[in-house]
């Protein structure tokens, strides 16, 4: 991902304020509510029968934290996202058979959640930088797909 120095600073400054537990759980939960067909990958998570069930599901929250921790790791390696996410790309492609479009959807949901959490601090410039990052991460995760 090519970010200007200003964009990198904006991404890093905001990310320093992110509560990975809360934001991760909310982002994954929203993905499952807004795009219900994505739930098929999480059937082992138990009750996903309603928006409140999804948003309150401890397995959704725990996996959301895991997802956002990996995203956080990616922020430390913006110059090598494909390398950083190679193993996860392989896992999601070969073993889990996740549609790579879901990575783009989750990235966009993450941007919505960040805007929700940070309000005025999530300026159009910050959003622009984050859109580049989530697109780069989605592309890296889709890299191993044939």
UniProtKB/Swiss-Prot annotation:
Residues at which heme b binds: 63, 92
PROSITE patterns, per database record: GLOBIN
Modification Phosphoserine occurs at: 44
N-acetylvaline PTM sites in chain numbering: 1
Any one Gene Ontology BP term: hydrogen peroxide catabolic process
Family classification: Belongs to the globin family.
Biological role stated in the UniProt entry: Involved in oxygen transport from the lung to the various peripheral tissues.
Protein name: Hemoglobin subunit beta
Gene label: HBB
């Amino acid at each position: 991902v090519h970010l200007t120095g200003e964009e990198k600073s904006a991404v890093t400054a905001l990310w320093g304020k992110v509560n990975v537990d809360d934001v991760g759980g909310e982002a994954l939960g929203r993905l499952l509510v807004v795009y219900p067909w994505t739930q098929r990958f999480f059937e082992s998570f138990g009750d996903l029968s309603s928006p409140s069930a999804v948003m309150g599901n401890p397995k959704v929250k725990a996996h959301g934290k895991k997802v956002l921790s990996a995203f956080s790791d990616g922020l430390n390696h913006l110059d090598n996202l494909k390398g950083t996410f190679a193993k996860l790309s392989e896992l999601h492609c070969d073993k889990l058979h996740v549609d790579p479009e879901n990575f783009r959807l989750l990235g966009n949901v993450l941007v919505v959640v960040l805007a929700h959490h940070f309000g005025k601090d999530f300026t159009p410039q910050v959003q622009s930088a984050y859109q580049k990052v989530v697109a780069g991460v989605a592309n890296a995760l889709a890299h191993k797909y044939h």
